[in-house]
Amino acid sequence: MDELPTRFISSFVVEFISDFMHFCVEKYGFSTEEISIICVVATESTREIRHDGYLLKTYGTEVQAIPDEFRFPVSVQFVCRRLGMRRETTRRKLEDLARRGFLNKIKGGYALPAQTNAADYTQELRDFLVAKISNLRTYIEKIPV
């Protein structure tokens, strides 16, 4: 097979997203908007771990969570622009997610809280995502070359 299996990979990615959404709805009772908001905030507030070798080496495993001082604020404006949501709806949902402990309200916006001990609501989610990536590797290895 000389061509990249784009349809196969695309199908797997869509399944990955669908399963992720289902997991979040079932496990946490999130709405689809809440899942989207948390994804944007988590992605942006932990962006540095993907670009800084020290942070990756120090906090990239399950041994130690990224400390709050390395988590950058994500503004209401950024979230509503990124998701195409109304500002007031975005603000209300962010406040509610912070009130429920899923996000931290910090100076300049919101951040994903450090996931440690009893406060770690994302352990099962991380395990789910890692298993899905492992499944993708298995599927890719089976593609004839």
Residue ranges and their predicted role:
Residues 58-61, 75, 102, 108-131:
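Short, cationic-aromatic polyanion-contact patches
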Residues 33, 72-75, 90-93:
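Amphipathic alpha-helical interface surfaces
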Residues 1-39:
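N-terminal leader segment of winged-helix/HTH proteins
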Residues 34-41, 58, 82, 102-105:
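C-terminal regulatory/effector modules of DNA-binding transcriptional regulators
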Residues 65-66, 71-81:
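A short alpha-helical element within helix-turn-helix/winged-helix DNA-binding domains
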Residues 84-99:
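Short amphipathic alpha-helical interaction segments
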Residues 28-33, 44-61:
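Short helix-coil-helix linker/hinge
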Residues 124-145:
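Amphipathic alpha-helical dimerization/coiled-coil segments
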